Amino acid sequence: MFASYKSIQETCAFEKLSELAQSPYDLTQPGALQADNRLQRYQVAGQAFKLFYATEQVDDRVLAGLQAVADECQLVSQYRAMRTGAVMNKIDGFVSENRRVLHTATRDLFSGEPAEASMNSRAKRELEKLSHFLDALDAGEIVNEAGEAFTTIVQVGIGGSDLGPRAVYEALKSYTIVGRRAAFISNVDPDDVSMALADLDLGKTIFNIVSKSGSTLETVTNEAFVRRALLENGYDSARHCISITGEGSPMDDPDSYLASFYLYDCIGGRYSTTSMVGCVLLGFTLGFEQVMAFLRGAANMDNSADEVDILKNIPLLMALIGIWNRNFLDLSSLAIIPYSQALYRFPAHLQQCDMESNGKSVDRQGRAVQGKTGPIIWGETGSNSQHAFFQHIYQGTSPVPIEFIGFSESQRGKDIEVQGCTSQQKLLANLFAQMVALACGKKDQNLNKFFAGNRPSCLLFAKKLTPYVMGSLLACYEAKIVFQGFAWNINSFDQEGVQLGKELAKRFLREIGGEEEGFHGIESAFLNEVQRGV
């Protein structure tokens, strides 16, 4: 199936781009950012956002080469195939998951002709279930043992069941229904769980247990922790727990859960935020109307990613500029810096989504990849990050590309003017200053004050962070990650490295529990040595 698709190294444009990378656009030359209307020309508008990329080390020749890469690798054609239900999660000729990839179907709800009908109808059915469930909560039909309303929902899950929903909830916390909140339990660390439980009014709390298989080790363990706490405090856990799981899994049990919502094999955990994995939590805290706005934003960004012209397609252009930085300029990491405190958990979500997707060394035909794949993803909010690690970004020996995210208006609309400008104006001034300073640098005979410049960055900019805009932002990055995986000709939808760690953890647990008496492998030797004298 994938033999007809090229990786970037197999394209005709690869050699030309490699030549251009020997002398990339010099952002430090006088007037570099203003030459040829660069600031005006190097921007793309789409779905509430503008992408400004004049501060990247690209020029028209590079952009033409990247367009050729997109065309030769059939990036948009592969994206369309994914959206319409092609089996994209596979490795040709080798044992693999062999699944469709349909996270986009969970929000393809707003046109008469969805890209893929069967998964779309399931998504609509789950949303209808959620709407009825939320209505019953609001009407007082679902209450606790004392007849009181639930005020808190706790998401119990790990990986994609935690990071994406947590990032979006924190981003949209300003829109929460008065009197409702969310909390999260993810780590199997007992201290984390017990501290989370200590901060709750258990009687007014619903626990949302998320596991597609119904057997995820950390989640099953934490669910037992939660149920014990409920029992010890005199509560019926079946009246306080709901599940999001695969249909027919051990967690699809009406006797043990207040309600169950379904998650399907064609939706990977890191891409599941617009499924019930995120929507149940967001529906409880924000309300169903805001959930639909969030999904609409994601759906519209999905549709805009269907454009073949890279200068009209924000996620595709971001993906290709990222490939330019990674494969041609040999930049090994990428910092995500949102100038919005509401997005403080978003870099962690993107870290998982990107690195678990594209941290691969085998292509889709089971061969070793020919070049570099996904960069290391990290980040923090601005302007805090300026006072944490920007020293390294400015003057370190390893240049770090940055994707900035910003908004012209604050989310809550409360501000103060000090020294002639508002806090939001100060925030934006700092954002814009970083982009210009990183690009242009500063000459100084004192080398300790010398800034080399040519540190590439771009900016995703919108008016205000709303549920619609958050959905659009999430889908933008999902599409970007998928496009890059297609360009590298890797499977962005499995995580075999994670599976190996899980298998070995189970072997250690059997050794700790004495289930393999007489077995003396590396597990036994490792445990004996590490724990000796502790």
Swiss-Prot record:
Catalytic machinery residues: E356, H387, K502
Gene source species: Desulfotalea psychrophila (strain LSv54 / DSM 12343)
Protein name stated in the entry: Glucose-6-phosphate isomerase
GO molecular function per UniProt: carbohydrate derivative binding; glucose-6-phosphate isomerase activity; monosaccharide binding
Sections of the chain in a coiled coil: none
SUPFAM superfamilies cross-referenced by the UniProt entry: SIS domain
Major location (coarse): cytoplasm
Name of one Pfam family that matches: PGI
Reaction(s) this enzyme catalyzes, per UniProt: alpha-D-glucose 6-phosphate = beta-D-fructose 6-phosphate
Gene Ontology biological process terms, A to Z: gluconeogenesis; glucose 6-phosphate metabolic process; glycolytic process
Enzyme Commission no: 5.3.1.9
Gene this chain is encoded by: pgi
Pathway listed: Carbohydrate biosynthesis; gluconeogenesis; Carbohydrate degradation; glycolysis; D-glyceraldehyde 3-phosphate and glycerone phosphate from D-glucose: step 2/4
Keywords: Cytoplasm, Gluconeogenesis, Glycolysis, Isomerase
Record family assignment: Belongs to the GPI family.
